[in-house]
Structures are given as C-alpha cells and as structure tokens.
C-alpha cells in the first residue's frame, strides 16, 4: 500500500537530484548542453533539408550560399555576446513558453502545409529553411528565454537571409556567374559587419562599408587569379574574410 507514494517520492527526488546536478554545472557547460540539444533536435527534425542542402552545395549550385549566412551569423553572434549586457535580468517563463510554442507552431505549419503546396518552387523558395529558422528560434526562446533571444535579435534577423529568393535576384541583378554570386554574398558580410560593430549607427555604417571594400578587393583577386575556383570559394572566402578582418580591426 505504501509502494505507490514511495515511488512518487523517489521519482521526485530523482528529478530534483538531476536538476541540482544540472544547475551545479559551470554556466558554459549549461550553455553548451542547451545548444547541443537544439542542434541535435534540429538535425533530427530537418535532416532531409540538411541533406538536400549538402547535395545542392556539392553540385555547385547557388544555394550553397546558405553556409555563408550560417558562418557569418555565428561570427556576428560572438561579437554581440562580447558587448556589455543592458537588458534587465527579468524572466517570465509563461511568456517564454507561449511565444516559443507559437513560433514553433508557425514553423510546423510552414513545413507541413506550405512546403507541399509550393513543392514546384522548392529550390527557389526553400521554405523548409524558413521553417528550420523558426524551429531554432522558438527552441532558443523555450530554453534560454525571450529576453536573451531579443538581445541577439539582429543576428536572428540576419539568419533569415537563408530565404534564397532575394539572393538569387541579387545575383541576376549583378549579371549572373560566379563573380556575381560572390558579390551578392558580400551583402551578407556587409550586414554582418554592421551588426557586429554597430554599437552606434556611425560605427555600423563604417564597418559595413569597410567589409564591402575588403570583400570586393578579395573577390577581384579571386576572379583574376583563381578564375577556375569552385563557386563556394567565391561565395565564402571574400565575405567571411572581410568580416573577420573588420571584426579584428574593430
């Protein structure tokens, strides 16, 4: 007769012990565990999208620029994280859960409803990447809270550049070809530099211009001396190198 309550108490004690061990960890380890969980969940939920993106990149398609967006966003996030925190240490878990679940619901609707509806334009729109963005963002809200996510709002906004249609239009506007693809990705590095260094509007503008100047110089070198380089080199090297140089100089 006493087995039931004892079992419940044992289960509660086990949960409390697990929570205590988790919160006893160094904050860096807790941060790593949370991001590890988000990455694993995203890889499991969107493995087909990731495999498709890898295949597109291996085939030398324009869609490989998405990796440049991801790498640039990670670099910019590190720069933003180094700034002095200004938000109040207030956390409302109910709001976090509501906002996180709503965003995740929208992502699920895009993945399950809109994606099949616009299957003919899959490579042009890549709505699955938009759904993945919503999944990661909502997971971050649920695990970290809304205020910490808002602190990196510009970085999250930058990650929306994985929606490929504007990039494709920019490449066509610049004339098409590998050099045009590289020039279009410099828009990513310019935006990233402005966010990373933009403690003021003036600093952000100067950083963006500097990233574009350095990026176009590197792109010219690749076009002239390494003309046969793969498309991914045109898309990644000038943009990421310019972002790193501006970040180091700042």
Please identify what each model-predicted range represents.
Residues 2-250:
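Hydrophobic N-terminal alpha-helices or hydrophobic patches in metabolic proteins across all domains
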